[in-house]
Amino acid sequence: MTDFFHVILTKPLLNLLIWLYNVIPGQDIGLAIIALTILIRLLLYPSFQKSLKSQKHLQDIQPELDEIRARHKDDKEAQTKAIMEFYQKNKINPFSSCLPLLIQLPILIALYQVFLRGLSGNIAGDLYGFVPDPGSINTNFFGLANLANPNPIFAVLAGGFQFIQSRMMMSRNQPGAQGMANVMNKQMMYFMPVLTGIIAFRLPAGLALYWVVTTLFAIGQQYYIMKKG
Protein backbone atom coordinates (compact mmCIF):
# COMPACT_ATOMS: atom_id res chain seq x y z
CA MET A 1 0.00 0.00 0.00
CA THR A 2 2.89 2.33 0.85
CA ASP A 3 4.56 1.62 -2.50
CA PHE A 4 1.26 2.20 -4.33
CA PHE A 5 0.79 5.57 -2.57
CA HIS A 6 4.37 6.49 -3.44
CA VAL A 7 3.93 5.63 -7.13
CA ILE A 8 0.56 7.34 -7.70
CA LEU A 9 1.01 10.47 -5.57
CA THR A 10 4.38 11.09 -3.92
CA LYS A 11 6.56 10.39 -6.95
CA PRO A 12 4.51 12.48 -9.43
CA LEU A 13 4.44 15.43 -7.00
CA LEU A 14 8.18 15.13 -6.40
CA ASN A 15 8.88 15.13 -10.14
CA LEU A 16 6.59 18.11 -10.68
CA LEU A 17 8.37 20.01 -7.88
CA ILE A 18 11.82 19.27 -9.31
CA TRP A 19 10.67 20.11 -12.84
CA LEU A 20 9.40 23.47 -11.58
CA TYR A 21 12.67 23.97 -9.68
CA ASN A 22 14.59 23.38 -12.92
CA VAL A 23 12.52 25.68 -15.14
CA ILE A 24 11.88 28.62 -12.78
CA PRO A 25 14.74 31.16 -13.03
CA GLY A 26 16.97 31.35 -9.99
CA GLN A 27 16.52 27.71 -8.94
CA ASP A 28 14.84 28.60 -5.64
CA ILE A 29 12.97 25.67 -4.09
CA GLY A 30 10.67 28.16 -2.35
CA LEU A 31 9.44 29.50 -5.70
CA ALA A 32 8.97 25.92 -6.91
CA ILE A 33 6.88 25.13 -3.81
CA ILE A 34 4.73 28.23 -4.40
CA ALA A 35 4.17 27.27 -8.06
CA LEU A 36 3.35 23.67 -7.07
CA THR A 37 0.89 24.92 -4.45
CA ILE A 38 -0.93 27.13 -6.96
CA LEU A 39 -1.21 24.23 -9.42
CA ILE A 40 -2.65 21.98 -6.69
CA ARG A 41 -5.15 24.66 -5.63
CA LEU A 42 -6.31 25.16 -9.23
CA LEU A 43 -6.76 21.40 -9.54
CA LEU A 44 -8.82 21.29 -6.33
CA TYR A 45 -10.85 24.40 -7.17
CA PRO A 46 -14.02 22.56 -8.33
CA SER A 47 -14.29 20.54 -5.10
CA PHE A 48 -13.45 23.61 -2.99
CA GLN A 49 -16.11 25.67 -4.77
CA LYS A 50 -18.76 22.97 -4.28
CA SER A 51 -17.81 22.57 -0.62
CA LEU A 52 -17.88 26.31 0.06
CA LYS A 53 -21.29 26.73 -1.53
CA SER A 54 -22.59 23.81 0.54
CA GLN A 55 -21.13 25.32 3.70
CA LYS A 56 -22.68 28.70 2.91
CA HIS A 57 -26.04 27.00 2.34
CA LEU A 58 -25.77 25.27 5.71
CA GLN A 59 -25.08 28.60 7.39
CA ASP A 60 -28.03 30.22 5.62
CA ILE A 61 -30.45 27.56 6.91
CA GLN A 62 -29.01 27.53 10.45
CA PRO A 63 -32.01 29.42 11.94
CA GLU A 64 -34.38 26.76 10.55
CA LEU A 65 -32.21 24.00 11.99
CA ASP A 66 -32.18 25.75 15.37
CA GLU A 67 -35.97 25.95 15.21
CA ILE A 68 -36.21 22.20 14.54
CA ARG A 69 -33.87 21.47 17.46
CA ALA A 70 -35.92 23.70 19.78
CA ARG A 71 -39.17 22.06 18.64
CA HIS A 72 -37.87 18.57 19.45
CA LYS A 73 -35.53 19.45 22.32
CA ASP A 74 -37.07 16.78 24.59
CA ASP A 75 -36.93 13.99 21.99
CA LYS A 76 -33.48 13.50 20.46
CA GLU A 77 -34.64 10.71 18.17
CA ALA A 78 -37.42 12.84 16.71
CA GLN A 79 -34.99 15.76 16.45
CA THR A 80 -32.47 13.72 14.46
CA LYS A 81 -35.20 12.35 12.18
CA ALA A 82 -36.63 15.84 11.55
CA ILE A 83 -33.18 17.24 10.74
CA MET A 84 -32.41 14.40 8.31
CA GLU A 85 -35.79 14.91 6.61
CA PHE A 86 -35.02 18.62 6.36
CA TYR A 87 -31.65 17.83 4.75
CA GLN A 88 -33.27 15.46 2.25
CA LYS A 89 -36.03 17.93 1.40
CA ASN A 90 -33.49 20.69 0.71
CA LYS A 91 -31.00 18.30 -0.99
CA ILE A 92 -28.26 19.06 1.51
CA ASN A 93 -25.30 16.85 2.34
CA PRO A 94 -23.98 18.09 5.72
CA PHE A 95 -20.68 16.28 5.16
CA SER A 96 -19.90 17.72 1.72
CA SER A 97 -17.92 20.58 3.28
CA CYS A 98 -15.41 17.98 4.50
CA LEU A 99 -14.52 16.90 0.95
CA PRO A 100 -11.59 19.30 0.37
CA LEU A 101 -10.05 18.28 3.70
CA LEU A 102 -10.36 14.59 2.82
CA ILE A 103 -8.70 15.27 -0.53
CA GLN A 104 -5.97 17.44 0.99
CA LEU A 105 -4.95 14.94 3.68
CA PRO A 106 -3.30 12.40 1.32
CA ILE A 107 -1.76 15.30 -0.62
CA LEU A 108 -0.30 16.72 2.60
CA ILE A 109 1.11 13.31 3.55
CA ALA A 110 2.63 12.97 0.08
CA LEU A 111 4.03 16.51 0.19
CA TYR A 112 5.65 15.79 3.54
CA GLN A 113 7.58 12.97 1.86
CA VAL A 114 8.22 15.12 -1.21
CA PHE A 115 9.75 17.95 0.81
CA LEU A 116 11.79 15.58 2.96
CA ARG A 117 13.28 14.06 -0.19
CA GLY A 118 13.42 17.22 -2.28
CA LEU A 119 14.89 19.44 0.41
CA SER A 120 17.50 16.84 1.31
CA GLY A 121 18.48 16.29 -2.33
CA ASN A 122 17.82 12.54 -2.04
CA ILE A 123 15.83 12.36 -5.28
CA ALA A 124 17.88 10.70 -8.03
CA GLY A 125 16.17 7.31 -7.75
CA ASP A 126 12.67 8.81 -7.98
CA LEU A 127 13.05 11.11 -10.98
CA TYR A 128 11.40 10.29 -14.30
CA GLY A 129 13.67 10.06 -17.34
CA PHE A 130 12.53 13.43 -18.71
CA VAL A 131 13.18 15.32 -15.43
CA PRO A 132 16.87 16.28 -15.12
CA ASP A 133 18.55 15.80 -11.75
CA PRO A 134 19.48 19.33 -10.58
CA GLY A 135 22.14 17.95 -8.26
CA SER A 136 22.19 19.93 -5.04
CA ILE A 137 18.96 21.73 -4.09
CA ASN A 138 19.03 25.39 -3.07
CA THR A 139 16.84 25.37 0.04
CA ASN A 140 17.36 29.05 0.89
CA PHE A 141 14.17 30.94 0.11
CA PHE A 142 15.40 34.24 -1.38
CA GLY A 143 18.44 33.75 0.85
CA LEU A 144 16.29 34.57 3.91
CA ALA A 145 15.19 31.19 5.30
CA ASN A 146 16.33 27.59 5.00
CA LEU A 147 13.20 25.68 4.01
CA ALA A 148 14.78 22.37 5.03
CA ASN A 149 14.55 23.38 8.71
CA PRO A 150 11.63 24.47 10.93
CA ASN A 151 11.05 28.21 10.95
CA PRO A 152 8.93 29.98 13.62
CA ILE A 153 7.99 32.83 11.27
CA PHE A 154 6.43 30.47 8.74
CA ALA A 155 4.71 28.59 11.57
CA VAL A 156 3.11 31.82 12.87
CA LEU A 157 2.09 32.82 9.34
CA ALA A 158 0.51 29.40 8.74
CA GLY A 159 -1.53 29.64 11.94
CA GLY A 160 -2.41 33.30 11.36
CA PHE A 161 -3.74 32.84 7.85
CA GLN A 162 -5.61 29.72 8.98
CA PHE A 163 -7.37 31.89 11.58
CA ILE A 164 -8.24 34.54 8.97
CA GLN A 165 -9.78 31.93 6.70
CA SER A 166 -11.80 30.44 9.57
CA ARG A 167 -12.90 33.91 10.67
CA MET A 168 -14.11 34.68 7.15
CA MET A 169 -16.37 31.64 7.25
CA MET A 170 -17.68 32.47 10.73
CA SER A 171 -18.55 36.01 9.62
CA ARG A 172 -21.08 34.45 7.24
CA ASN A 173 -23.03 32.93 10.13
CA GLN A 174 -26.48 34.27 10.92
CA PRO A 175 -26.37 36.73 13.84
CA GLY A 176 -27.45 35.10 17.08
CA ALA A 177 -27.25 31.54 15.73
CA GLN A 178 -26.50 29.23 18.66
CA GLY A 179 -26.78 25.78 17.12
CA MET A 180 -24.39 23.01 18.08
CA ALA A 181 -22.65 23.25 14.70
CA ASN A 182 -22.16 26.98 15.20
CA VAL A 183 -20.67 26.48 18.67
CA MET A 184 -18.29 23.80 17.33
CA ASN A 185 -17.27 26.05 14.44
CA LYS A 186 -16.36 28.82 16.89
CA GLN A 187 -14.24 26.41 18.90
CA MET A 188 -12.51 25.11 15.77
CA MET A 189 -11.87 28.68 14.61
CA TYR A 190 -9.37 29.05 17.45
CA PHE A 191 -8.24 25.44 17.87
CA MET A 192 -7.22 24.73 14.26
CA PRO A 193 -4.92 27.77 13.81
CA VAL A 194 -3.13 26.94 17.07
CA LEU A 195 -2.77 23.29 16.04
CA THR A 196 -1.57 24.34 12.58
CA GLY A 197 1.06 26.63 14.09
CA ILE A 198 2.31 23.96 16.50
CA ILE A 199 2.60 21.35 13.74
CA ALA A 200 4.24 23.81 11.33
CA PHE A 201 6.77 24.75 14.02
CA ARG A 202 8.01 21.15 14.09
CA LEU A 203 8.11 20.52 10.33
CA PRO A 204 10.46 21.74 7.58
CA ALA A 205 9.60 25.33 6.66
CA GLY A 206 8.94 24.16 3.09
CA LEU A 207 5.78 22.42 4.26
CA ALA A 208 4.77 25.48 6.30
CA LEU A 209 5.31 27.62 3.18
CA TYR A 210 2.98 25.31 1.28
CA TRP A 211 0.32 25.77 3.97
CA VAL A 212 0.75 29.56 3.98
CA VAL A 213 0.33 29.78 0.21
CA THR A 214 -2.55 27.28 0.02
CA THR A 215 -4.41 29.14 2.79
CA LEU A 216 -3.85 32.52 1.11
CA PHE A 217 -5.12 31.04 -2.14
CA ALA A 218 -8.14 29.61 -0.29
CA ILE A 219 -8.89 33.01 1.26
CA GLY A 220 -8.88 34.57 -2.22
CA GLN A 221 -11.09 31.82 -3.64
CA GLN A 222 -13.41 32.09 -0.66
CA TYR A 223 -13.78 35.85 -1.08
CA TYR A 224 -14.43 35.47 -4.83
CA ILE A 225 -17.00 32.69 -4.45
CA MET A 226 -18.84 34.45 -1.61
CA LYS A 227 -18.95 37.72 -3.56
CA LYS A 228 -20.12 35.91 -6.65
CA GLY A 229 -22.71 33.99 -4.64
Predicted segments with their positions:
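Helix-loop-helix
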Residues: M1-G229
